[in-house]
Design a protein with these regions (language model features):
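GHKL-family ATPase ATP-binding module
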Residues: 1-19, 50-55, 63-66, 70-88, ...
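Conserved helix-loop functional segments at active or binding sites
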Residues: 31, 35-38, 59, 63, ...
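C-terminal interaction appendages of subunits in large macromolecular complexes
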Residues: 370-391, 406-410, 414-415, 426, ...
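Conserved short strand/loop->alpha-helix "switch" segment adjacent to the catalytic nucleotide/phosphoryl-transfer site
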Residues: 32-54
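A short glycine-centered beta->alpha linker in the GHKL/HATPase_c
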Residues: 91-94
Length: 611
């Protein structure tokens, strides 16, 4: 039930029985979608709501596979808009089919005997998909009968039962409601990443996505091999136990990288299982070598994956991206103890049996320690300098809300524009949203950091101040902005500055790019306008093709302006380019890219090959 907001805003309004509203389950989901799927979005980001809808449907099919009912899931996404999912499990019990997809808190997964370690939250998930779809259809195939029900925005339209020769299982079709997910589109790369993660966690499961077969034979080893952007220093260590699987290696890159899962769910923000692994992997390695090692040196360059199965898992949000459970099961061991005991026993045994791997690991840790100590003096001075500069730093014009705030609904909107020079930063500063948009101004071209050690991050004032502004010296957990946006001119010099900044991030903070935080701001190349009936009609063009189309539309004799740099765009105009319709291009790495080779080719010495 809800109280009318008018009562709160205007106490003089009479408060009667008529002010009390009861919402049906489907109405409640549509009225408060964020409670069920997080943010809505349009599909341009991997966390957007349409991917949560897809995941909720697939989760139920995955649970069938886990119950050894069906080894194949077929998924078709038509025109990146309409989704159908067919599994070959047992099929939803037909007598309760309507309730199972339309009545909240109805489902078989409350019976832990049937689904002891379930990923699909049957009480809510599929119902939310139904409510938030303009069209929804479910078919349950069981023992020669198929029951078919169709819905629109959660309302039942048709319900029929007929004979069938098809195999048992469930078919679901849905089309997200464009009124809620405005101009949405499923991005194949986000969908494929999601589906591959399902196969890594469920070896032997075949997912057929738009005709493409996705399969994993080696679980988390395949995950690391497919996602690592640097060569492992030793073969991936892969260890499995009851309800736990881990895989890890070290690379020559800076930082740490983790992939964590609970009951097949990718916990992108980690949680108690990932924290336990980080703590105990470092402690176990330190105890094995029996040396006075710093945990940061042990974990530097570590790339790891951990998957656990938890009974009745508790997540910190409905989207299930961070595990909050303290216990593996009601009355069972804590997550920390369970993970710690496994890591301590299995990793220690492995290192004793594979001393050649242990030798490589020790060498890597000692190299990290040597570099850390070499820059210790510099980092202390740099931190003091950055602290003083941050108090009156003209380079950083900060915003009010940040990604690492404890609370707040604007955290995800926080961003920082990295610009070149005062003219460009001045225009952005005057037109920005001070609540969520910060500006960092570079002084000319930054240093080419390729091949340099992390010492340069502290010795170079601009790099040190940028690192301090982002708050990433000690890892991504403290990152202050969800989007780090490079805003440079669209000329050769601007492109060079982009490359230099991306090199800096890839060299020292690769997770910033791997986790999808870095973007390029697309600004218009042309302004085409024409005065009609005393009013200017203006079109901003981002390409030559758009310019030609605008000239045709605004003919005859339109006025054409070419923007040579960001500084030429007035603050009044700039606000159009950094508002809700801001065009951003995400900086991403292909799975086949190796960072070292990539940087060597583009930013290394001018060899014959590069020429």
């Amino acid at each position: 039930m809800e109280e009318n907001n008018e009562l709160i805003n205007n106490p003089a309004v009479e408060y009667t029985d008529d002010n009390i509203r009861h919402l049906s389950d489907m109405e409640h989901v549509r009225t408060r979608p964020g409670m069920y799927i997080g943010k809505l979005g349009d599909g341009s980001h991997a966390e957007d709501g349409i991917y949560v809808l897809l995941k909720e449907i697939i989760d139920n099919s995955i649970d069938e596979f886990k119950m050894q009912a069906g080894k194949k899931i077929e998924i078709i996404i038509e025109e990146n808009l309409r989704v159908s999912v067919r599994d070959y499990g047992r099929g939803i019990p037909q007598g309760k089919l309507i309730e199972a997809v339309s009545v909240l808190n109805t489902g078989g997964k409350y019976d832990s005997k049937a689904f002891k370690k379930s990923v699909g939250l049957n009480g809510v998930g599929v119902k939310a998909v139904n409510a938030l779809s303009s069209r929804f259809e479910v078919r349950s195939y069981r023992d020669g009968k198929v029951r078919i029900a169709t819905f629109a925005k959660g309302d039942l339209l048709t319900d029929t039962t007929q004979n069938t020769t098809e195999e048992n299982g469930t078919y679901i079709f849905f089309e997200p409601d464009n009124l809620l997910f405005e101009n949405y589109s499923f991005r194949p790369e986000f969908v494929e990443t999601m589906l591959r993660n399902y196969t890594y966690l469920n070896t032997g499961l075949a997912i057929i996505y738009n005709g493409q077969r996705i399969l994993s034979r080696n679980g988390l080893v395949d995950l690391l091999n497919d996602n690592m952007t640097a060569v492992g220093l030793y073969p991936i260590i892969h260890l499995k136990g009851e309800d736990i699987e881990i895989a890890f290696t070290h690379t020559g890159q800076y930082g740490e990288e983790y992939y964590s899962f609970v009951n097949g769910q990718h916990t992108t923000q980690g949680g108690t299982h990932q924290s336990a692994f980080k703590e105990h992997i470092a402690r176990t390695i330190k105890e094995y070598f029996n040396k006075n090692m710093d945990y940061a040196d042990i974990r530097n360059g570590l790339v790891a994956a951990i998957a656990v199965n938890v009974e009745e898992p508790l997540f910190e949000s409905q989207t299930k991206i961070k595990l909050g459970s303290t216990n593996m099961a009601p009355g069972g061991p804590t997550v920390n103890k369970f993970v710690g005991d496994f890591v301590k026993t299995e990793v220690d045994n492995y290192l004793h049996k594979h001393t050649d791997v242990a030798d490589v690991m020790l060498q890597k840790i000692q190299e990290s320690e040597k570099e850390r100590k070499a820059i210790a003096g510099v980092t202390k001075l740099a931190r003091e300098r950055a602290k003083k500069a941050n108090l009156h730093n003209r380079k950083l014009r900060d915003c009010r809300f940040h990604l690492n705030d404890a609370k707040g609904d604007k955290k995800e909107e926080s961003c920082i524009f990295i610009t070149e020079g005062d003219s460009a930063s001045g225009s952005i500063t005057k037109s920005r949203d001070v609540n969520t948009q910060a500006v960092f101004s570079l002084r000319g071209k930054p240093l080419n950091s390729y091949g340099l050690t992390k010492k340069i991050v502290y010795e170079n004032e601009e790099f040190n101040l940028l690192q301090a502004a982002l708050n990433i010296e000690d890892g991504m957990e403290g990152l202050r902005y969800n989007k780090v946006i490079v805003a440079t001119d669209a000329d050769v010099d601007g492109m060079h500055i982009r490359l230099l900044l991306i090199t800096f991030f890839l060299q020292f903070f690769p997770d910033l790019i791997k986790k999808g935080h870095v973007y390029i701001l697309q600004t218009p190349l042309f302004r085409v306008r024409n005065r009609k009936k005393g009013v200017y009609e203006t079109v901003y063009c981002y390409s030559e093709e758009e310019r030609i189309a605008a000239i045709e539309r605004l003919s005859p004799n339109p006025e054409i302006t070419r923007f040579k740099g960001l500084g030429e765009i007035s603050p009044d105009e700039f606000k159009h380019f950094i508002g809700k319709d801001m065009r951003l291009e995400q900086v991403s790495l292909r799975k086949t890219d190796l960072v070292k080779e990539l940087l060597e080719f583009y930013m290394g010495k001018n060899t014959m090959e590069r020429q």
